[in-house]
């Protein structure tokens, strides 16, 4: 068995590690008939009778981190989190919610003054309240709700090298 980037993207699988990081990176897709569009728009569309020809990853990333929690090493993720920094702007994608990944930004500007443990915790708690989560066979909504701020906080601290 093997997975491909194109298959993961076109399938829009909620458990896709690849889709989560590409969403955080702000990737775009090119489809033979529909043309170029943001990956986030493609994931929300119902396009099924087309051909994915390219995945376009924009330049300018100054840092990125991906974290996930799995019940065991070979499982699909219970929850996935990718954080990308461009200049001083952060973009967070949360995947395996169990729905397809969705991106979030620092709407309240909590990260504008730099990352400390306290700021990372405050942002993680605030963001986790905005994330729509659900349950499935891998885990409950409650377990994902408890895990989300942990992954976001750890990701921010790792990205910025804060110990």
Language model segments and positions:
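C-terminal structural segment of proteins
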Residues: 1-163
């Amino acid at each position: 068995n093997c997975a491909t980037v194109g298959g993961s993207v076109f399938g829009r699988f909620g458990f896709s590690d690849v889709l989560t990081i590409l969403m955080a990176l702000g990737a775009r897709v090119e489809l033979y008939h529909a043309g170029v569009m943001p990956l986030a728009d493609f994931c929300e569309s119902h396009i099924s009778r087309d051909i994915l020809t390219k995945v376009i990853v924009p330049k300018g990333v100054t840092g990125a981190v991906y974290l996930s929690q799995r019940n065991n090493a070979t499982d699909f993720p219970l929850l996935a989190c990718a954080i990308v920094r461009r200049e001083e702007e952060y973009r967070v994608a949360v995947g395996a919610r169990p729905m397809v990944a969705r991106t979030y930004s620092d709407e309240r500007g909590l990260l504008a003054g730099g990352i400390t443990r306290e700021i990372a915790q405050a942002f993680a708690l605030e963001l986790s309240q905005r994330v729509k989560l659900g349950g499935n066979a891998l885990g409950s909504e409650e377990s994902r709700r408890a895990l989300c701020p942990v992954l976001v906080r750890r990701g921010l601290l790792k990205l910025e090298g804060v110990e």
